[in-house]
Structure formats: structure tokens, C-alpha cells
């Protein structure tokens, strides 16, 4: 008799119909955001645009081209929390009319329109940002 009453009470107080409630410390918890996993982020996010600019600046410092390149479009962006933020970007960059010998603001540089000088590259870059140290690193930059 007591067993029947106890079972009835358990069924009445359980809103999960016998299913186990989620344990917030277990791996069974279903979530769309998992700490440490890369997450898609809007390509027009200010952090993404700043990371893309750092990628282009690294590209400009590593090439012998006489003209500066700048980003024209970010097609894909992921962000991962790892002692700061790691951005993983797919960026289209293009040659500008600004020469490296002059110190230009990239925002003021127009893209080349001369077919002989026009050049577009598609890049994958990873940019590690540590905001509290005002630090930007570009450990991965692949362009073709």
C-alpha cells in the first residue's frame, strides 16, 4: 500500500513524465552554444571587421607587392572563446591604388580598376584577440 502511494506521489510531482531532469553538470545537457566551440558570427560584426583588417595588415607586411591590399568582403566568420577571442575568417581582399611607400589609411584607398593591376585574393585567416591586453595576433593567413 505504501509503495503504491509513494509511486503515485512521484508521478504527480514529476513534470517530465518519468524522464530524468537535466543535470546542468552532465554532458547530456543540450545547448546550441558550447563553451570553447567555434560559433558562427555575423560577418558585419565590428570585431569581425577589425580582425579582417588585422589579417590584411599582416598580408601587406608579408608581401613584396608595391600596392596595398584591403578587405572587400568577409564571406564567413566564426568566433571561439580561448583566452580572448579567436576569429576564423574567409575574406576576399583586393589590390588598391595606394602604394606601400606612402603611409595611407586603408579606408581611403580605392580598389584598382586598371585590368592589368587589378588583383583579387581569397584568404582564410585566424586572428587571436586579447582585448584586455590590446593584443592582436594572426597565426594563420592563407591566401590564393
UniProtKB/Swiss-Prot annotation:
The entry's keywords: Disulfide bond, Glycoprotein, Protease inhibitor, Secreted, Signal, Thiol protease inhibitor
Annotated glycosylation sites: 61
UniProt cross-references to SUPFAM superfamilies, sorted A to Z: Cystatin/monellin
UniProt family annotation: Belongs to the cystatin family.
Function: Inhibits papain and cathepsin L but with affinities lower than other cystatins. May play a role in immune regulation through inhibition of a unique target in the hematopoietic system.
InterPro entries with a match to the protein in the record: Cystatin-F (IPR042886), Cystatin_dom (IPR000010), Cystatin_sf (IPR046350)
One of the record's GO cellular component terms: lysosome
Record-annotated site: Reactive site: 36
Molecular function terms from GO: cysteine-type endopeptidase inhibitor activity; peptidase inhibitor activity; protease binding; protein homodimerization activity
Annotated Pfam families: Cystatin
Leader sequence residues: 1-18
Biological process according to GO: immune response; lysosomal protein catabolic process; negative regulation of microglial cell activation; positive regulation of myelination; regulation of antigen processing and presentation
Cystine crosslinks: 98-109, 123-143
Coiled-coil segments: none
Protein name: Cystatin-F
Location within or outside the cell: Secreted
Motif Secondary area of contact per record, residues: 80-84
Gene: Cst7
Major location category of this protein: secreted
CDD domains the record matches: CY
